[in-house]
Amino acid sequence: MKFFALFIYRPVATILLSVAITLCGILGFRMLPVAPLPQVDFPVIIVSASLPGASPETMASSVATPLERSLGRIAGVSEMTSSSSLGSTRIILQFDFDRDINGAARDVQAAINAAQSLLPSGMPSRPTYRKANPSDAPIMILTLTSDTYSQGELYDFASTQLAPTISQIDGVGDVDVGGSSLPAVRVGLNPQALFNQGVSLDDVRTAVSNANVRKPQGALEDGTHRWQIQTNDELKTAAEYQPLIIHYNNGGAVRLGDVATVTDSVQDVRNAGMTNAKPAILLMIRKLPEANIIQTVDSIRAKLPELQETIPAAIDLQIAQDRSPTIRASLEEVEQTLIISVALVILVVFLFLRSGRATIIPAVSVPVSLIGTFAAMYLCGFSLNNLSLMALTIATGFVVDDAIVVLENIARHLEAGMKPLQAALQGTREVGFTVLSMSLSLVAVFLPLLLMGGLPGRLLREFAVTLSVAIGISLLVSLTLTPMMCGWMLKASKPREQKRLRGFGRMLVALQQGYGKSLKWVLNHTRLVGVVLLGTIALNIWLYISIPKTFFPEQDTGVLMGGIQADQSISFQAMRGKLQDFMKIIRDDPAVDNVTGFTGGSRVNSGMMFITLKPRDERSETAQQIIDRLRVKLAKEPGANLFLMAVQDIRVGGRQSNASYQYTLLSDDLAALREWEPKIRKKLATLPELADVNSDQQDNGAEMNLVYDRDTMARLGIDVQAANSLLNNAFGQRQISTIYQPMNQYKVVMEVDPRYTQDISALEKMFVINNEGKAIPLSYFAKWQPANAPLSVNHQGLSAASTISFNLPTGKSLSDASAAIDRAMTQLGVPSTVRGSFAGTAQVFQETMNSQVILIIAAIATVYIVLGILYESYVHPLTILSTLPSAGVGALLALELFNAPFSLIALIGIMLLIGIVKKNAIMMVDFALEAQRHGNLTPQEAIFQACLLRFRPIMMTTLAALFGALPLVLSGGDGSELRQPLGITIVGGLVMSQLLTLYTTPVVYLFFDRLRLRFSRKPKQTVTE
């Protein structure tokens, strides 16, 4: 009591304490970073290696495997996957959450160094690594277009000037330049001209390489001067290479231009990028795992004017895609929802107390509690994101509850004629323990969340801590500022004023009287209520088992990603046409604002598209509805598929795929994997629970298989090395020399001119110069025939792997899909040599599913322990927790009604309900125990009186929590997909709980009291202390 009096009788100190809390909160708010969600990115590092011209199988065995063995020894690697395609290998390392990305990078570099001696000697450069997740959508895409400069020149500006500068910006993890390649001098050989002149391809390669040499020449000096020696040993342009003498035939010089077309072109002609309908170079910017997306985007935008000045005016630099506007809009929506919630809960107080002065008190205490929370959020390193702001929105109902309980009890004493200061002290003393019990037991709900590991634990931790801090500050404010303001602002009510009840007041009295009558009937029919209570428990179990489940609600971020997968034998020219056709279909859709895409590189039959939708207020459909509409139009394109998926703020794993969810097949027997993967994929494609089923296994590419006749080769004086060198020179876009420029290094690329490689007959024109100087056609010692070959070879760990990706059709959940996949695998009878498991987000969903029930039980157990300690009783906590089954039924029924699957957000709602609905029982039990102790009432009289006496604060706190959550249900706009499941769960649970617990709690209280008396050694003792 002295504690309360200290603040009630020292108003200046109490006000200044509240002002200090508020100022600290305002300061913290101004310094808090902004993000879509809490920081939950896994540390991911990509290791890349190249060997131009090498087949996928060669890359996998000679490059990927040695690197994997070395990288696999690094501590903290949770997953290692690799993909090897024509001339390139990429290994993706995903680390544990607690692994420092910089320390991991040092270990990766050491592992690369250790494996270097095992790698092929012909690699043009050492393997490199980048700290970025390739499966993440870019946070920003910049495009370069020009009517003056070529694509190669644009690429040069992008990779040489723009990308390095952008990479230095804080938060940027990777800048991927696509749409073309660096400028190069291309030597397109004419096989017939070479044969006529008796010049081999190796002769051309050697001549070009020897003609362009950059070596130190030294210096001359005498007694007084020194001269640096400089020669014209370098050739820079196609015009300089064209007259190069490469051979003498019968005394005549054979120049490079006589046997080849030499052009200033690009390093790899099989690349194309577009923005809308225009050729473009794309700069796809991804953030570091620990970086804040808003701060990073703002830093890039601030740098753009400076970047524009570094490139010619004829080049147009534009932002094609920016992830930040929808994130900002989503956060603005949450902030508006928070303000509306505060206004609604204050309205509840006014309606019940019908006093402007009394309403001012929660109107002050609620903002103080919420604003003060920002200071703690800053100290904890949190951000302003959808979950933390949703926590504050929900907290409005909690923090006002504490103020309501104190305020209502003080108001009750004032209505009885007590003086304000005395009423404030007496009223606070009576409910101080109640408020403490409600707050501590509510915080206890979140203890299991704080101890939860993995991605779900990291995701929910910020929500739980934010809400717990708000409750803690609210507890302090409710026991200090609220009673002080009541004592100095409120006035004692006169008896005649108490009789003037109109409007809402009269309705409340009528409700209370009706409740009293119905409660008498219920207390005389306790068995029926017991049956209802047991029924709700059974219904909870059935609803939880049957409700569709997913990991995280599908978000509409306004951005779509598309993966193009064409026939495995498609040419680059045809693939570029497919990209243009798909982009036209997408661009013509009225909901699309911008579309960019690219194709080429090591995987000719694939491409990527990035689609920006119009803002939510300019379109009526959701992202998923737009995807469903486009899917029908895109299906009409023959020879290729475009798989669309909505970009999400959370994407688990480092695998790049054409759909949102992955199912991975592993085997140590590559033949078994190649046999069963098509069977499994075709079976999954028939399931109605899955859409857009596709696979990264591409083992049906067209190949021309050459078989050497080694005996003939030996007789003709030709070795395998010379034959393979011929093929690499002719068809491998072989980099034969380097051109050094001040800003970059460029390549001289040699191949047979594409005009002579339009069909298989090109092989017949190839020849090798033997050791006698004779031209021997390839057909003399080799035979060839068409065959199938893999376009890529994939590993997970050191096992062969294939990942099947899928999306969810409208109306289907991830639990439906995972159950259907499990059934399909069982029906197919897949052998034990082929192992299947979910990956990425689907894997985390499986892990979360297994822990959800344990988490709920742990929360209930924690609350029971806290209540047992507070009440020094084993029984009363059970009475209080008996309110939970009805809340669970209401929450699950509401989700079913709104066709919302049970997600991680809904789980938060269930956890919150555990804390919310028990408040009603705490208020009833507290006053019933007090009445038994000091009023000499029977248990039935005590609980009946407690129910009637606490009816008004119970209704106030429930409606406050309900109105606090209602804006989440009704909110639209950006980010509503995250807010609505939480609001639906809470509102549904509160409505059902309020209808039932007003009756079930008294019955359970009496049941346990009778049970206690039956087993008590002292039957005359009324209350368990």
UniProtKB/Swiss-Prot annotation:
Part of a tripartite efflux system composed of MdtA, MdtB and MdtC. MdtC forms a heteromultimer with MdtB. This is Multidrug resistance protein MdtC. One of its GO terms (biological process) is xenobiotic detoxification by transmembrane export across the cell outer membrane. It is a multi-pass membrane protein. It is found in: Cell inner membrane. Residues 1-6, 354-359, 412-430, 491-852, 918-947, 1008-1025 are cytoplasmic. Belongs to the resistance-nodulation-cell division (RND) (TC 2.A.6) family. MdtC subfamily. Keywords: Cell inner membrane, Cell membrane, Membrane, Transmembrane, Transmembrane helix, Transport. Induction: The mdtABC operon is transcriptionally activated by BaeR. Residues 30-335, 380-388, 454-467, 876-894, 971-984 are periplasmic. It comes from Escherichia coli (strain K12). Gene3D superfamilies: Multidrug efflux transporter AcrB pore domain, Multidrug efflux transporter AcrB pore domain like, Multidrug efflux transporter AcrB TolC docking domain, DN and DC subdomains, Multidrug efflux transporter AcrB transmembrane domain. Its main location: membrane. GO terms for cellular component: efflux pump complex; periplasmic side of plasma membrane; plasma membrane. Pfam families: ACR_tran. One of its GO terms (molecular function) is bile acid transmembrane transporter activity. The MdtABC tripartite complex confers resistance against novobiocin and deoxycholate. MdtABC requires TolC for its function. The keyword Transport applies. The chain crosses the membrane at residues 7-29, 336-353, 360-379, 389-411, 431-453, 468-490, 853-875, 895-917, 948-970, 985-1007. It comes from the Bacteria.
